[in-house]
């Protein structure tokens, strides 16, 4: 195979010993059936790291994300992972597990931010009282705990579905986890910064990284907007269209359906509305 193209945001490419590359091998079919996965050793002729960028707030030792140019990169047939045209399936198998792992890590980060918020609220005395005694701060803590508990239970439920029925059965729940990971990190991170004041914005505290981590979670492994669209489509597949004029829960419609099912027995119900 000869591979040509460019790929941005190849994570850890600057230190990798091999690259996982998904490339179109059959352009005449839809992408999900025309992509194949290759394992390409670093240093292969034609594989060039053109630039490496780092996320804002990343640590000095992090390898960053690179722009790669593939210029007539020749690889043997044995470099293909799996069968031709199955690259999308391999990619999706990795992404499903990766997304719930993102959620698990985000849970721990959000819990730490909430702990920091609570410690600061119980410790900082200003304007005649502790922060913990001020109603707006109490609302911050209550809202954060509520969001975190919902997120935690959603992740646990998704993990149970995966363990019990497999990843395919948990597709909707994995999507929910991915959406919540971003929103919960951002909201709890922002509140934690507010409770810590200007100190929370300094490099001496990890809270800006919590907030930026929430932003990153809204982009990593697919943007939040794409996950919401896909989630809605999967959810709506379980529902059928009704009469476009009258919803099924409209009272007259329900009475007609009940009469069709139970007949004259409904006449003995005095509270039943009469049309």
Named regions from a protein language model:
Residues 4-50:
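A short core secondary-structure module
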Residues 10, 30, 56-62, 83, ...:
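Short alpha-helix boundary/capping segments
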Residues 18-22, 37-39, 65-72, 90, ...:
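Conserved hydrophobic/aromatic beta-strand scaffold that supports enzyme active sites
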Residues 45-74:
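Flexible, small-/acidic-enriched active-site or ligand-binding loops
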Residues 72-89:
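Long, acidic (Asp/Glu-rich), low-complexity accessory segments flanking structured domains
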């Amino acid at each position: 195979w000869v591979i040509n193209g460019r790929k941005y945001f190849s994570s850890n490419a600057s230190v990798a010993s091999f690259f996982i590359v998904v490339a179109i091998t059959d352009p005449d079919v839809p992408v999900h059936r025309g992509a194949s996965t290759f394992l390409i050793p670093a240093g292969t002729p034609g594989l060039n790291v053109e630039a490496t960028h780092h996320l804002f707030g990343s640590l000095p030792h992090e390898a960053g994300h690179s722009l790669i140019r593939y210029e007539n990169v020749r690889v043997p047939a044995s470099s293909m992972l799996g069968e031709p045209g199955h690259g999308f399936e391999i990619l999706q198998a990795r992404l499903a597990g990766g997304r719930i792992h993102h959620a698990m890590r985000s849970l721990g980060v959000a819990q730490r931010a909430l702990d920091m918020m609570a410690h600061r609220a119980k410790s900082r005395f200003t304007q005649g009282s502790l922060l913990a005694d001020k109603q707006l701060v109490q609302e911050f803590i209550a809202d954060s705990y509520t969001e975190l508990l919902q997120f935690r239970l959603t992740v646990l439920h998704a993990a149970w579905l995966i363990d019990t029925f497999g990843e395919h059965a948990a597709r909707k729940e994995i999507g929910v986890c991915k959406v919540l990971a971003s929103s919960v990190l951002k909201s709890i991170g922002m509140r934690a910064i507010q409770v810590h004041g200007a100190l929370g914005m300094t490099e001496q505290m990890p809270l800006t990284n919590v907030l930026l981590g929430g932003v990153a979670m809204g982009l990593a492994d697919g943007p939040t907007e794409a996950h919401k669209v896909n989630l809605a489509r999967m959810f709506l597949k379980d529902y059928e269209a009704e009469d476009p004029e009258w919803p099924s829960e409209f009272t007259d419609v329900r009475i007609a359906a009940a009469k069709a099912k139970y007949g004259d027995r409904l006449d003995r119900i005095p509270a039943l509305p009469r049309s």
